[in-house]
């Protein structure tokens, strides 16, 4: 699966070979095979004269859903991102540069938070101050797995971020490879270097999702992507 981001915002794009448009295009690539695809899109952010950061995210087997509990199970163990490319806007974006930001501001870390370490995707402890790191937790401040299994259609979780350089990060969440639209989930984190942390709780109404994409009472994959604006 290939996703496209402009200044951290996910973009819908057209695959010129199939004429299909969407935020995620899935390609079947055999071992040792090389594929070249032409795409086109109109950014939904940016004004004339702006320079936007363009990033692609590759997710291997995006339709895979876990069938058992596993700490290390997550699509981010199979993610690859190319280096950002800057594009120059010669015209206004299709929404004339409109921005609907839900910014989560930083707060000063407590000493306990400052001294703490978190698991990386391989289950190893590491400090988060040198590089930006985001953790998904439940409301009891416990890290949760990258799968979800709910019976009532409501998902409650907290995203916590810290470390790295001063920057804004656009958070995009996916369930079974399908993006959660902005009316369901929308957040931009502001990271400040040093002893600062961002934290925001989310209550996601999964009943708004396509019933063919999310199954109540069954395991569903959940991951989110933090991309600098």
Q: Locations of the language-model features?
A:
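Aromatic/hydrophobic beta-strand junction motif of beta-rich domains
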Residues: 1, 155-163
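Short beta-strand elements
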Residues: 65-120, 229
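Short glycine/proline/serine/threonine-rich loop/turn segments at secondary-structure transition edges
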Residues: 44-56, 64-67, 208-223
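Short acidic/proline- and small/hydrophobic-mixed sequence motifs that coincide with surface turns
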Residues: 1, 12, 49-51, 165-169
């Amino acid at each position: 699966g290939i996703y496209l981001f402009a200044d951290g915002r996910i973009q819908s794009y057209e695959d010129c070979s199939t004429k299909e448009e969407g935020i995620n295009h899935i390609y079947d690539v055999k071992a040792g095979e090389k594929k070249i695809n032409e795409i086109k899109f109109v950014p939904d952010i940016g004004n004339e004269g702006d320079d936007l950061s363009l990033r692609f995210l590759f997710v291997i087997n995006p339709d895979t859903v876990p069938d058992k509990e596993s700490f290390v199970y997550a699509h981010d163990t199979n993610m690859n991102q190319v280096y950002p490319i800057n594009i120059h806007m010669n015209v206004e974006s299709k929404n004339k540069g409109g921005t609907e930001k839900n910014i989560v501001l930083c707060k000063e870390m407590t000493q306990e938070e400052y001294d703490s370490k978190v698991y990386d995707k391989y289950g190893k402890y590491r400090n988060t101050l040198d590089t930006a790191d985001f953790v998904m937790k439940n409301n009891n401040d416990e890290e949760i797995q990258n799968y979800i299994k709910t019976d009532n259609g409501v998902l409650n979780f907290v995203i916590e971020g810290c470390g790295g350089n001063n920057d804004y990060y656009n958070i995009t969440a996916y369930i079974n490879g399908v993006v959660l639209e902005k009316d369901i989930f929308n957040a931009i984190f502001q990271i400040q270097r040093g002893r600062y942390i961002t934290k925001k709780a989310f209550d996601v109404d999964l009943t708004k999702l396509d019933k063919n994409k999310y199954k109540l009472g069954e395991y569903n994959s959940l991951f989110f992507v933090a991309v600098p604006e």
